[in-house]
Amino acid sequence: MKAVQVRKAYDLVTAEVKKPVLSKDDEVLVKVKRVGICGSDMHIYHGTNPLATLPRVIGHEVTGQVEAVGANVQSLKPGDHVVIEPISYCGSCYACRKGRPNVCAKLSVFGVHEDGGMREYIVLPERQLHAVSKDLPWEEAVMAEPYTIGAQAVWRGQVEKGDTVLIQGAGPIGICVLKMAKLAGAAVMMTDLNNERLAFAKENGADAVVNVQAEHVAERVLEWTGNEGANVVIDAVCLPETFALSIEAVSPAGHVVVLGFDERAAQISQLPITKKEVTITGSRLQTNQFPKVVELLNGGRLMHNGLVTHTFSVDDVHHAFQFIKEHPDQVRKAVITFD
């Protein structure tokens, strides 16, 4: 069968590998239908993902159809449509005991630490698979995992109905955060450098948008919130300067949610954090967000609405990665098909 593998930086190959088989009673064999290309996949391709090990079959935004199940599998049967939860964990470390396996001491992420889903068939434990409606188009189902990232950020920021939320960055993850924040009942302002992205954010529910090259973000936030500041700031740009801006723009008693892995230091003093008693929290992957997202997808309350802009056959995967590399402003989300 075909599998898309990054062997080293910029060395992407479509390899012929053996089709996996069930070896444990709790395992499920899935025929892959769609795989989204995430920013982290591009970082693996570029050799700049600090967490990935190579060579690696990439892909963690995966949907497909169950082909076979192990003897002890109860929740799934052949023919079911599923989405993939890409994390495995030990279940016994401090993070797992606290109900946060997404930061398990022995965390393994599908497509990052272990071979992922950009191949024709995969085998995973039942607990990493969630059934979705067979009426749900594959291009909608493949967005489940990115939506869980948005749901996690909104949960970590404790976003509630009536809150004002500033989301920095109107890229794919920023839009996923936007969708989940609006479903939570928040008013949302979004920032970006790109007017087309900001227009798309407005189409998807943003109440206000700011081009950071044309306007002063913190001043606009104060105007928008009646001088209060944003109750929650979610940084999906993930640069030292946007982290610092988050602290400036957040309201007293507010939350700042950080999604990035930038190792550079930000210039932030203690004073605004303590004076405003700001809660700063990281948000990584997701914890128990799949059931909520699946329910929203099945009910038609979550739709990509233009977020998926490009689809490529697995036979054209090299062209897909080259196109994203050369035309990043044209691509919101690209999806690889395995039909």
Swiss-Prot record:
Induction (free text): Induced by galacturonate, repressed by glucose.
SUPFAM superfamilies assigned: GroES-like, NAD(P)-binding Rossmann-fold domains
Highest taxon above the source species: Bacteria
Protein name: Uncharacterized zinc-type alcohol dehydrogenase-like protein YjmD
Enzyme Commission code: 1.-.-.-
Keyword Cell membrane: no
Necessary cofactors: Zn(2+)
GO terms assigned for molecular function: oxidoreductase activity; zinc ion binding
Binding site residues for Zn(2+) 2: C90, C93, C96, C104
